[in-house]
Each structure stands twice: as C-alpha cells, then as structure tokens.
Amino acid sequence: MDAVELARRLQEEATCSICLDYFTDPVMTACGHNFCRECIQMSWEKGKGKKGKKKQKGSFPCPECREMSPQRNLRPNRLLTKVAEMARQHPGLHKRDLCQIHQEPLKLFCQDDQTPICVVCREAQEHRMHRVLPLDEAAREYKLRLEEDIKYLREEMMKTETLQAKEEQTLTEWQERVKERRERILEEFQKVVLFLVEEERRLLQILKKEEDDTLGKLQDSKASLDHQSRSLDLILLQLEEQTQQEPLQMLQDVKDTLTRKESLSMQYPEVVLPVAIKTVCRVPGQIEVLKSFQEDVVPDPSTAYPYLLLYESRQRRYLSPPPEGSAPYSKDRFLAYPCAVGQKSFSSGRHYWEVGMNLTGDALWALGVCRDNVSRKDRVLKSPENGFWVVQLSKGKKHLPLLPNSIPVTLTEPPSHMGIFLDFQAGEVSFYSVNDGSHLHSFSQVAFPGPLLPFFCLGSPKSGQMVISTVTMWVKG
C-alpha cells in the first residue's frame, strides 16, 4: 500500500460518517461504529419524531448498520480522538486534498474550470472535454504566473506607497499653508480694523476741528450781527421818539442824532448757505468691497429717448438706431427726457454698477434707480415720491441737488466715474465717487415699493457722454 493510499485510509478512519469531518469527541455505539457525540445525539433526536416500528425504550438505530443501540451505552473512543487530532495537524491528511465528491486524491488540474480534480472527475461528463494537466505540472505553470502577479502587485504597491507618501506630504504642506493663510487673513484684517479705527478717529478729529473753526467764525459773525442789531434798535428807537417831539425840541438835538447815525459802522458778513464741509467721507477699500456685488448693467435700447443714442463698443454697432430709422414711440420708451433704464430689474439682494462720465462743464445729468412703472411720457419731478432715487448735476454747479428744500451735496469737482450701490432688502441706494472712493449720498427708507431699474439721464446734446459697461450713451444733436 503506497503512502497516498495509506493517507486516504487513515483519513477515512478519522472521519465521522455523519458530518464528513474529522471526529470531535468521538463515541462508540454498542455495535462498534464511531461517531461524533454531538452528531449521533442529533441523529437520534431527529429519529424520535419519525414514525416506524416500535423501538425499545432508550434504544436507537445505528446510522451505519441500523442495529439498535442503547443511548446510555455510548463509550468515548480516546484512541480515535488522538487519531483525528493527528489527521488535523498533518499537512498530508487535510480534507481538501481529497475530492469532496469521490473522496479520491486530487491529482489533476482542470484548466478550463481552474480547479483541482480527481481521476474519477476526469472521466465524468463535466470534465471529459476539458484541458487537464497533472497537478505538479499545473502547479509549476501557475506558480510562475502567480510569481509574475506577485512581482506586478509589489511594483504597484511600491507605486501606491510612493503616492501615499507624496499625498501625505502634500496634505501636510496644504494644511500648513491653510494655517499660514488663516493666520495671515486674521493678521491682515486686524491691521485693517486698526487702520480703519485710526482713520475713523482721524477723520472725526478733522471734522471736529473744521466744525469748531467754522462754528467759531459763524458765532463771531452772529455776535457781530447781534451787536449791530442792538445798536440799530437803539438808534431807531431814539429816532422814532424824536420824530414824535415838538418841532423846536426835535430840531434842538437833530445834529447829535444825525451824527450818531452817520458814525454807525455797518458790517454785513457774507453768509453762504449751505456751508460746504471740506472733510470727505472716504472709507479705504470700500469701493473694492462694493465691487464684489458688481453687476453687468446695460441700458435697454427699447426704453431710450428717441434721440438718445446707445453704441456698443465691442460689437461696434448702435443698440438703438438713429431716429431716422427707428420707431420711437413704443410704450416703454422715455419721451419727456433723454433717459433710459437698465435691461434687468432688481427686486432683492445687493447690486453695484459703475458709470463713466465724459461730460462738459455745463452738463445736465442724473443717475440712480427708478420704479419699473414710472411715468415715461410726462415730465415729473425725479423724487422718491414719484419713484426716482437719483442724484443729479446741472449747469456746471458743483453740488448734487436732491429734493426740494433739502441741503444739496457739495462737491469739490463733479465726478467723472460714479458707483451706485443698491441694497434692496435694506431699502438703501448709495452713490460714490470712484475717483477718490468718497461717499456722496444715500437714500434710506423702510422698503422699496417694488422692482427697481438702473436709471440714466442726459440733459442735452451738449452734456457729453455716459459710459455704462461697454455701452456709450449720448444725445444726438
């Protein structure tokens, strides 16, 4: 008997016929057959519920020979326990070395199914037409293939580990850069905050000095006028009393009275209202912040006054054709003034746009926002009550007239580049000079009554041009 056959026989002896695995706690029945204790007990438990011939009390049939065996006569087989343990530990006696179907040694390898088979499997219908190699030959062939795969996978593992190391380094460097940038942002903003606090203090000090100086001059002027008024009152009273006297009495003192009147020095200081405030409200960096809300605002040619020309510089064409070839009287077109509104209306959010102004010294113009339903056929006052929130400059005056009876904003120079900021939810529209970043004026109210449109207006052909985004606007002469 060769070693393989001996191993097979030994494996059979160490295998339970119920679970087909090596014995665990083997016991022997009265008839001499061996089973795992748990396997034979489970087999007999299942047999209790089956109908059949009457069994002796406490006796059950042997699963191998069907001979009746008392349950209490199960005897532990310690020798078989050692044999089963040896079979488990011996590499040549593993269960996987035998065919699970035929219990024959696995000596062949099916290349089609890529699985070991026994000689009985080789002749079976399932493998009869398959390519089959001896197990050792197949092992050598597949070992080479596996070694190639191992080499490839090790190379890939090295690449992966290299990339992992690079990614970890990149992650560390990135986190460090983020940390540095965060610290830099906090540091720079702290500098800006300190700078703004100092700038605020400086501007307020300048304004306070200007207030004190101007207030002193105004108070001195007022005091002088008060003194002059009292002197005039006194002389006037004396003259009125003297005119009521008898002729002789009146004429006796007339020389002194006239002398006092002639000696009175009259002073009339020039009073200019409103007094111009020289201190400019300029917040450093504010225009840059507002530009984060910048919109591409373009005038709507269908709303433009018939003689208001819109020229698109990029496309090199008129957006609104000259009046000779247009139909000027559409319902959306402004007819009372050389005005136009933007193509897009705003009913929420924050929006900022800029307008360049190449205007003459006596230009008439207006900028701002208006309701989408303002009167376009009639001349109306451009006021919030009529749906206009605009600033305007007229006839070269260096101030922006706003509302009737309001104090106009005084300018050192008319702006050539203006910014308009609309905060719809806050009910506020503000105007800035982009040239120096100064704030010119703001309209504030609880809420706007409806959608708003950017508003542009030129007064006459002599006013010059406005540039809105890439569109140039002027009045045809």
Swiss-Prot record:
Pathway: Protein modification; protein ubiquitination. GO terms for cellular component: cytoplasm; lysosome. It catalyses: S-ubiquitinyl-[E2 ubiquitin-conjugating enzyme]-L-cysteine + [acceptor protein]-L-lysine = [E2 ubiquitin-conjugating enzyme]-L-cysteine + N(6)-ubiquitinyl-[acceptor protein]-L-lysine. It comes from the Eukaryota. A zinc finger (B box-type) spans 94-135. Zn(2+) binds at residues 99, 102, 121, 127. SMART domains: BBOX (SM00336), PRY (SM00589), RING (SM00184), SPRY (SM00449). Its EC number is 2.3.2.27. It is found in: Cytoplasm; Lysosome. Residues 135-225 form a coiled coil. Keywords: Coiled coil, Cytoplasm, Lysosome, Metal-binding, Transferase, Ubl conjugation, Ubl conjugation pathway, Zinc, Zinc-finger. Auto-ubiquitinated. Expressed almost exclusively in the testis. Residues 276-475 form the B30.2/SPRY domain. Its main location: cytoplasm. It is an enzyme of class 2 (transferase). One of its GO terms (molecular function) is ubiquitin protein ligase activity. InterPro entries: B30.2/SPRY (IPR001870), B30.2/SPRY_sf (IPR043136), Butyrophylin_SPRY (IPR003879), ConA-like_dom_sf (IPR013320), PRY (IPR006574), SPRY_dom (IPR003877), TRIM/RBCC (IPR050143), TRIM17_PRY/SPRY (IPR035687). PROSITE patterns: B302_SPRY, ZF_BBOX, ZF_RING_1, ZF_RING_2. E3 ubiquitin ligase that plays important roles in the regulation of neuronal apoptosis, selective autophagy or cell proliferation. Stimulates the degradation of kinetochore ZW10 interacting protein ZWINT in a proteasome-dependent manner, leading to negative regulation of cell proliferation. Inhibits autophagic degradation of diverse known targets while contributing to autophagy of midbodies. Autophagy-inhibitory activity involves MCL1, which TRIM17 assembles into complexes with the key autophagy regulator BECN1. Interacts (via coiled coil) with TRIM44 (via coiled coil). Interacts with TRIM28; this interaction prevents TRIM28 activity on BCL2A1. Interacts with TRIM41; this interaction prevents TRIM41 activity on ZSCAN2. Interacts with BECN1. Interacts with NFATC3 and NFATC4; these interactions prevent NFATC3 and NFATC4 nuclear localization. Belongs to the TRIM/RBCC family. PANTHER family: E3 UBIQUITIN-PROTEIN LIGASE TRIM. This is E3 ubiquitin-protein ligase TRIM17.
